[in-house]
A protein has these predicted regions:
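Multi-pass alpha-helical transmembrane bundles in non-GPCR membrane proteins
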Residues: 1-109, 116-139
Length: 139
């Protein structure tokens, strides 16, 4: 999920702010995502479980993307797919937070964690739909 959403964050910057900036930021964003997971893993092994960097990677783009969409006009149609992506991502986070109650609700047959991955897959499907549907906006 982390790598997918960091890539989408760079793509939104590329589409709305600057193509050059989006491409330039893609590598650092992907590295940031990997490092955040590795910091979490290492601190978890040390008994501390520091999720601060991981949380920043998970939530900052989902706060920044709506701001970018609001401040910078679209160059292509089908921007509604980015909003749909954000909604699916929010659903994934809610399902993750409700892991245990969902697991109990489904009689230990399905967990919120598993459903989170389905919602995250839907979220990452939305930019692909956008690319298939979009056309340049008229100025």
């Amino acid at each position: 999920m982390t790598l997918g959403f960091m890539g989408v964050f760079a793509a939104v910057i590329s589409e709305r702010v600057s193509a050059r900036a989006g491409w330039w930021l893609l590598g650092p964003f992907l590295i940031w995502g990997v490092v955040s997971v590795e910091v979490w893993r290492r601190t978890e092994l040390a008994g501390a479980g520091d999720l601060r960097m991981y949380a920043l990677v998970q939530f900052y783009p989902m706060l920044a993307i709506p701001l970018i969409l609001w401040l910078f006009p679209p160059r292509y149609t089908a921007s509604h797919r980015v909003w749909q992506m954000i909604l699916w991502y929010m659903a994934a986070k809610i399902l993750e937070a409700a892991d245990v109650p969902i697991h109990q609700l489904f009689g230990q047959q399905m967990s919120g964690h598993a459903l989170k991955h389905l919602a995250a897959a839907m979220a990452l499907w939305m930019p692909l739909c956008m690319l298939a549907e979009r056309e340049p906006t008229s100025k």
